[in-house]
């Protein structure tokens, strides 16, 4: 997974040739930490088809604010330089993440 910051967000997400999943998380977010190993497994499964990336909001608040992330966990799904889907809070399940990744293909 690619760690995103304000310096590389545009290049890695908006300008990506591949569809992109962006995982907004925080070290004190229990649900975020619980999902992390499964998201890493998905990243391996979809390697070469979908780019998986993450934003630690504790270290990159500006990125979270710019993307209007209001709670954690939040997953954004980008394709062709635009956000096409978003799931956050209690709506975030591994199944929902997988559904949205499949929709990017």
Task: State where each predicted segment sits.
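A short beta-strand-turn-helix
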Residues: 2-20
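Short, thiol/selenol-centered motifs that function as redox-active sites or metal-ligating centers
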Residues: 28-35
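Non-catalytic, surface beta->alpha helical segment in thiol-disulfide oxidoreductase systems
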Residues: 76-105
């Amino acid at each position: 997974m690619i760690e995103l910051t304000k310096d590389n967000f545009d290049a890695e997400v908006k300008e990506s040739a591949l569809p992109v999943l962006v995982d907004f998380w925080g070290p004190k977010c229990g649900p975020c930490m619980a999902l992390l190993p499964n998201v890493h497994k998905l990243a391996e499964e979809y390697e070469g088809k979908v780019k998986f990336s993450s934003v630690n909001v504790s270290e990159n608040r500006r990125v979270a604010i710019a993307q209007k992330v209001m709670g954690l966990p939040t997953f954004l799904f980008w394709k062709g330089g635009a956000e096409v889907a978003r799931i956050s809070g209690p709506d975030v399940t591994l199944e929902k993440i997988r559904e949205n990744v499949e929709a990017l293909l």
